[in-house]
């Protein structure tokens, strides 16, 4: 208690927060335990979602996993239950843009897990194309998957989250949802919408005790570039500098447990975000070199 008071006094004198000391390992503040939490995770069959699911089970959570690829979903569930046999894993296969699938996912949590504590909106789709080359189908698909489905699933989940234990919404945005990057204009616009929605919603649901975390990864070693909805230009963000899905997943777990509001889980992406805040003209010039 004396140590905490000492840090509080230091906070008053310097403006440093206790979280800054916690981030450096001096204090280990854990705001939320994930043990026995009932979690709905979308996009669970690959990439960050596939890496996140077993980590959540390891923390002691019960899961509803939603994804399009049924076989992959079953493989992930089998791996989880082999390692954590006491954890419940409910599978919902289908397209996140389908209203019936979203309803089925939320009801699976309510009926089979007894409620919902955490929603992780991880499902997404990508595209790399200049704005002028982006098709109408790409425009609509990027917002249907990355934004509209996320909002509508969150709306379905909120009444149950309000009754949950230490409730939380985790939204996956992107570094291109914080800074516009050439060839990611349409995809980035959808991710900007996710980041903005997360900030607004955080204020709106705080009175119910619901936290909102927005995650803004940089280039990550996933199938993103292999399954692009449209690809008419070379990716500006090089894949050889990507962080692993497992790293991003571990950072998400860390942020969830500590009640963070936003994380950028990659040094290069975090550097770009800071550079853009302090030297926006320079970043504008830099981006023209890739346009």
PLM region descriptions:
Residues 130-131, 135-140:
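Substrate-binding pocket helix/loop in short-chain dehydrogenase/reductase
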Residues 174:
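Residue(s) in the substrate-gating loop at a strand-loop-helix junction
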Residues 132, 179-185:
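Active-site loop immediately N-terminal to the catalytic Tyr-X3-Lys motif
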Residues 38, 45-46:
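Conserved glycine-rich cofactor-binding loop
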Residues 154, 190:
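Active-site helix of classical SDR
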Residues 207-267, 285:
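SDR active-site lid
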Residues 59-76:
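Conserved glycine-rich Rossmann-like NAD(P)H-binding loop of the short-chain dehydrogenase/reductase
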